[in-house]
Design a protein with these regions (language model features):
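An alpha-beta-alpha
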Residues: 61, 65, 80, 170-216, ...
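Exported/periplasmic ABC-transporter solute-binding proteins
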Residues: 246-247, 255, 259-326, 330-340
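Hinge/cleft segment of the Venus flytrap/periplasmic-binding protein
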Residues: 24-59, 191, 195, 211, ...
Length: 356
C-alpha cells in the first residue's frame, strides 16, 4: 500500500476544506430580479440571492441539459450537483447530445418523471419546442424550472437565467466602443450558435442592435451547433471567403477554436476574438491575450439557483420567479478583480450525472 506523506495529506485536506468553504459561502449573491416575471421587457432590479439552508426532505429532481460537449454546461452541472448536495436532495442529470435532439430531450424528461422525478430543471434545446411538455408538467403539479437557455412558456414555475439579449448586447457594445461612427470600417464575423435556440436568437438580437451606429460591418449570422468541429469549420470557411475580417465574435466554443485557427493562419496581428459568454478556456484565453473579452453570466450560480427554486417550489416556500446573476464583462484589465469560483467550475471537475 502506497504511503501518503503528511504534507500531501495536509494539502488534500486543505483543498477539500477550501472547496467546501467556497460551496458554503456562495451566497448571498449579487443578482437581478426581473419584474414582471417571464417578460422580455421586464424591469431588472438588484437583489441579493440567498438559498434555503437545507431541504425539508430528500426530494428527487430531474435535470436536463442540451448536451455536455463544452465547458459551459460542465459549469452548470457543477452548480447543480453542488447545490443538490448542499440542500440534501437527489438529482438525475440528463444530456440530450446536442441541439438537434429535441425529441430526445423531451423523452428523457418524461422518462425521468415517470421514474419518480418530483421537479424538473430544464436547460432547453428549443424556446418553443418544449412548451407542450412544460404544460403537461404543470398539469401533473410538477414544478418546471427554466435554466440558462429560455423557454417561452407561461406555465413555468420559475426561471434561473440571465438575458442572452444582454450578453450579446454587452459583447457588441464592447466592440462598438472601439469603432465609433466615423472611424475606419471593421468587418465582424458573427457566430451566434445553433439556429432556433432561444438563447441564440436573443444573443443575436442584442449583438446586432448594440453595433448599430458604429463603424462595424457585421456579416450575416453564421449559425451552427456548438460542437468544436462544427464551429472550427464555420470559422475556417468564413476566414477563407472574407479576408477583410477583423473580429471573430460568437459562442465560447467559437472563441476557443478560433485561437488556434488565427495562430495557424498568422492572423494574430489582424484578427481578434470575442465571446459572448464565459468558459474556462475563454477565461484562459483572456489571461493569455488570445481572446479580447467576454461577458460573464456565472453559469455555476444559475445552476445553483435553479436547484434552490425547485426545492422552494416543492416545499411551497417563497421564491423569486425570474432571477439571474448580475452580468459583468471581463477582459485582461479587470480579470483579477473577478472571483473565479463564482463564474466557473474548478479545473478538476468532471461531469456528474447523479446526486444520490
Amino acid at each position: 500500500m502506497k504511503k501518503i506523506s503528511a504534507p500531501t495529506l495536509l494539502a488534500g485536506v486543505l483543498l477539500s476544506a477550501s472547496l467546501a468553504a467556497q460551496a458554503a459561502n456562495w451566497y448571498p449573491y449579487a443578482a437581478e430580479q426581473t419584474e414582471p416575471a417571464f417578460s422580455d421587457t421586464g424591469v431588472k432590479k438588484p437583489v441579493n440571492y440567498s438559498p434555503l439552508p437545507k431541504a425539508a426532505k430528500k426530494w428527487k429532481l430531474c435535470v436536463s441539459f442540451p448536451h455536455m460537449k463544452d465547458a459551459y454546461w460542465l459549469g452548470v452541472d457543477y452548480g447543480v450537483v453542488e447545490e443538490a448536495k448542499r440542500l440534501g436532495v437527489s438529482a438525475q442529470i440528463l444530456e440530450a447530445g446536442g441541439y438537434t435532439n429535441l425529441n430526445k430531450q423531451i423523452s428523457q424528461i418524461e422518462d425521468c418523471v415517470a421514474g419518480g422525478g418530483q421537479a424538473v430543471v430544464i436547460g432547453g434545446i428549443s424556446a418553443d419546442g418544449l412548451v407542450n411538455l412544460v404544460k403537461s408538467l404543470k398539469a401533473k403539479n410538477i414544478p418546471a424550472i427554466d435554466v440558462i437557455n429560455g423557454i417561452n412558456s407561461p406555465d413555468l414555475t420559475a426561471k434561473s437565467l440571465v438575458s442572452f439579449y444582454t450578453m450579446g448586447q454587452e459583447a457588441g457594445a464592447y466592440l462598438a466602443k472601439k469603432h465609433p461612427a466615423g472611424s475606419a470600417k471593421a468587418v465582424v464575423a458573427w457566430f451566434p450558435g445553433p439556429a432556433g435556440a432561444g438563447w441564440v436568437e436573443a444573443a443575436n438580437k442584442g449583438f446586432t442592435e448594440a453595433v448599430k451606429g458604429s463603424s462595424l460591418e457585421v456579416m450575416a449570422p453564421i449559425y451552427g451547433d456548438t460542437g468544436k468541429e462544427v464551429q472550427a469549420k464555420l470559422v475556417e470557411d468564413a476566414l477563407q471567403s472574407n479576408p477583410a475580417i477583423r473580429y471573430i465574435a460568437g459562442t465560447a466554443v467559437t472563441a476557443e477554436v478560433s485561437q488556434g485557427i488565427v495562430r495557424a493562419r498568422n492572423l494574430k496581428d489582424k484578427v481578434q476574438v470575442i465571446s459572448f459568454y464565459l468558459t474556462p478556456d475563454v477565461y484562459a484565453g483572456i489571461e493569455k491575450g488570445t481572446i479580447m473579452a467576454s461577458p460573464a453570466d456565472a453559469m455555476v450560480i444559475q445552476g445553483r439557483i435553479a436547484i434552490d427554486q425547485a426545492v422552494r417550489a416543492l416545499e411551497g416556500k417563497d421564491l423569486i420567479k425570474h432571477v439571474g446573476p448580475k452580468i459583468v464583462t471581463i477582459d485582461k484589465a479587470n480579470l483579477k478583480q473577478i472571483r473565479r469560483d463564482d463564474v466557473l467550475p474548478p479545473a478538476s471537475f468532471k461531469p456528474l450525472f447523479e446526486v444520490k
